[in-house]
Amino acid sequence: MSPRISVVMSVYNGERWLREAVESVLGQPLGDFELLVIDDGSTDGTAGILAGYRDARLAVIRQPRAGLTVSLNRGIRRTQASLVARLDADDVALPERFARQVAFLDAHPEVGLLGTGCHDVDPQGRMLRTYCPPEADAEIRRALVRFNPFVHSSVMVRRDALERVGFYDESLPVAQDYDLWVRLSRVARMANLPEPLVLRRLTPGMISRARDTERLRAELRIKRGALRSGAYPAWCAIYLLKPMLALVLPPGLRGLLRRGAALG
């Protein structure tokens, strides 16, 4: 019998926090799941950590370095469940996450993409802030034209919706989640649970200046594509201005623009 949930996690040289991430999944009270961990060419102690688990629900896929987007798609193609959940290898799923999300999706069959709030923590696990995302489908759609309203590590998606839109776009090394949400918005309703059900770890090197520029270019491409496809109405072309302006701003000023877009 297939599990209820397939959890997909990609890891590259993640020995520092991997054990905490894996155990936060294996310890979920709703235990009817499989955990697929894609070891994306790690050269540290990642393989040894994963080899130490003897839980039949954990499957490890090892591959040469291919990048996050390719790794996630490889994991999704191996999933057996009708619900696919994400968790990054340095984040933590809080104990009631799966139970709360499955209960909501059972009660709302029209919802194909469900996220949650999160607690942002520093590398030592100290609390930085709590993020409460927009909750209802209409709110999320209004936000989606401006910024990414989902915590990637918190999402649970119906697999049939993923199949309809073709998984992550492997030509995008960054912002692949934002692109996927835009495409999913055309085939399914969306929701966020306001409760923080994930710890999202923020590390100093998460967004380098070069990576931030790459992300802005990807955001611009995604929004242009959404306008062309009809996912966004024509008036939303105004939201192309934010990434275009950010690309010509000094890096130190980009954060101000990003916060302004989120406040909307």
Predicted regions and their residues:
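Conserved nucleotide-sugar donor-binding catalytic segment
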Residues: R77, T116, T130-L220
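Acidic helix N-cap motif at the loop->helix transition within catalytic regions
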Residues: R16-R19, D44-G52, V92, E96
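Cell-envelope/extracellular polymer assembly enzymes that use nucleotide-activated donors
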Residues: P3-S6, E34, D179
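Short, acidic, metal-binding catalytic loop of nucleotide-sugar glycosyltransferases
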Residues: E23-D32
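A conserved acidic beta->alpha catalytic loop
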Residues: S24, D39-G48, A66, D88
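Glycine-rich, basic loop-to-helix element that forms the pyrophosphate-binding segment
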Residues: Q63-T79, R100
